Design a protein with these regions (language model features):
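Active-site core segments that coordinate phosphate-bearing ligands/cofactors
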Residues: 1-205
Length: 205
């Protein structure tokens, strides 16, 4: 048995020492299977008992992961959503299905923008930040907005910002975990992993 974080790793296939997985839901984390308890107080990372009591899961958490994409849907992407509803809206769809379809459409939209979002950078700290530095006052920001930047670049920058933060946490974890075994595959799971474009962005980063 185990908690949600440990069992999500099992479901993703991260069960052997050194296996790593990235989860992106409302919050997000990077978890690596390790054989012993460990703590990195400088990065606010710690290992908890895994679903297998002989192993531990070493976690670093992002307070708002795919929640940032939800914020985009509610505040930045209204024009794109209006286009979506006109093109693809179906009165017979459930609200849940419409929601999934809208996220799929936003994936198509950001796929039209080259990697790097025209230089725009986003920090995914919409509810403070936990790791690899703790600051409850940290906030989300866009950098490098110029006259030639549109909302589509901003939307893609949000996804890229989440993925860069995940890489940051993974690299910090590897300072301690590679003495065991470095994972050859990083598994990606959660609602954020449902989009092919997001998966490709994370893989590229």
């Amino acid at each position: 048995g185990g908690g949600d974080a440990s069992l999500i790793g099992v479901g993703a296939g991260a069960v052997e020492i050194g296996d790593a997985h990235i989860y992106s839901g409302t919050s997000g984390w990077v978890g690596t299977v390790v054989p012993e308890q460990m703590v990195d107080t400088g990065a606010m990372m710690a290992a908890i008992v895994g679903a297998n009591p002989e192993t531990f899961n070493y976690f670093g958490e992002l307070e708002t992961s795919n929640k940032c994409v939800g914020w985009v849907k509610d505040h930045l992407a209204l024009d794109e959503i209006g286009v979506f509803l006109k093109r693809y809206g179906n009165a017979t769809d459930s609200l849940e299905q419409v929601e999934f379809n809208m996220y799929d459409y936003l994936e198509e939209v950001i796929d039209t923008i080259p990697a790097g979002s025209n230089g725009v950078i986003f920090t995914p700290w919409l509810h403070g930040n936990r790791c690899p530095f703790e600051d409850p006052n940290a906030a989300g920001m866009f950098f490098n907005i110029r006259l030639n930047v549109g909302k589509t670049e901003l939307i893609r920058a949000v996804v890229e910002g989440i993925c860069f933060h995940m890489r940051w946490m993974l690299e910090r974890q590897e300072l301690k975990t590679t003495k065991y075994q470095k994972s050859k595959t990083v598994r990606f799971c959660g609602g954020g992993a449902l989009g092919e474009t997001t998966c490709q962005i994370l893989a590229d980063i």
